[in-house]
Amino acid sequence: MRVLKFIGKLILSIIGIFIAWLIGVCIFVPVYDFDEPYPFHGEYLHNPYEGMDSTAWLKCNFHAHTRTVGGVANGRNNSNELLDSVYRSFGFDHIGISNYNTISDYGKDNPSYVPGYEHGYGIFKIHQLGLGARKVRKIDYPLWQTLSMKQHTLNKIGQYAELAIPAHPSFVEKGYHPEDFKYLSNYKLLEVLNGYRKSPAHWDMALSNGHLVYLIGGDDSHSMTNINDPANRFTLINSKENEGSQLLKALVAGQAVGVAFPMDPTYTETFPHKRARFEENLPYLTKADLCGDTLRVAATKPLSKAEFIGQGGHVLHVETDVEEASYVIQPEDQYVRAVLTFADGTELWLNPITRHESPDKLYHPRLDHLNYWKTTLLWTAYIAVIGGVILLVRMKKKRNN
């Protein structure tokens, strides 16, 4: 009986410590104030594709998982070697591994290597990619997350990584809300295309409020035995150099295109068939020219549909069955982005043309400011409540004794 009591007390102690840690992590977070954003404005139209070399596209995937933590984490069916070989069979130039909360050094001798990881283990999938990472941010908020929590996480990841990227923002309804991206700042890329979700509403919210945020696409692959895991959502980067720092530099400059390649809804397609379909049907952007106020786009294949999208995600103009599509940017258009769809269903998502006062004023100031007074007041209140609870528990124990 004594042994059972001891085990029971030990289990309760462990549970108590875990709950205390959970509460502490979730409540002792700095409080931020946020300035009101303002949309893009000005006479200068910035085209991230200016000077593009239409022959220099690199196929890149930065979001994929392999076996870690003894196979506990999702990705247990992927060895590093298997993932690498499958992506190389599809002709990928950069094959990134972004395991949960750990940086893989696989392929670190390859010039295109980019150290990265996926941060987050909360129930609402509020995750981030840390690319060019030097260190892993260990702390996350497993339960709810306020806007301050989301901003603080981006800030902290960015201290130890070149890029902090909100991942699959539309994955869970109670995760990232589109409205969050009205105020969130201090990030330069958003995973708009993910193997599980597309997130145009979150991107358009950021762009509509003047945040110069470019897109990235990621398979988020977890199993190389699943035909629909590799080569579905990825990024084409316009760069002559397949070198890690140059890839990140091109992404930040917006010199990239997001790809949504059609999946097999029956899950019966073979890998040889998909590779052949991929090689035959994958289009490449050949033109994204800004001639005065006219945006002209074209690709290596005819366009089944070209959509030009602006403020609030509203479709401004559509053209169908053309070799080249164009749109005259209106004075009231604060930004314009294009989505090109092809006969087989493949989509190319382009980064936006944005308005600015001048070429040297592309980025707006950050909106977040740490409110030391509110933080101190709130933390003092939390400590007082916790202290009061501990005092009541001790008093109750004394009475019982």
Residue ranges and their predicted role:
Residues 191-197, 210, 255-258:
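Short, well-ordered alpha-helical segments in soluble proteins
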Residues 211-231:
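Short acidic/histidine-rich active-site segments
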Residues 25-169, 175-176, 180-185, 193-205, ...:
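A metal-dependent hydrolase metal-coordination microenvironment
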Residues 110-111, 184-190, 210-214, 232-234:
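Glycine-enriched alpha-helix->loop->beta-strand junction motifs that scaffold or abut catalytic
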Residues 85-87, 120-122, 137-141, 155, ...:
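Glycine-rich loops and low-complexity Gly/Arg-rich segments
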Residues 108-112, 159-161, 211, 302, ...:
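Short glycine/proline-enriched coil/turn segments at helix->beta-strand junctions
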Residues 1-52, 224-401:
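C-terminal functional module detector
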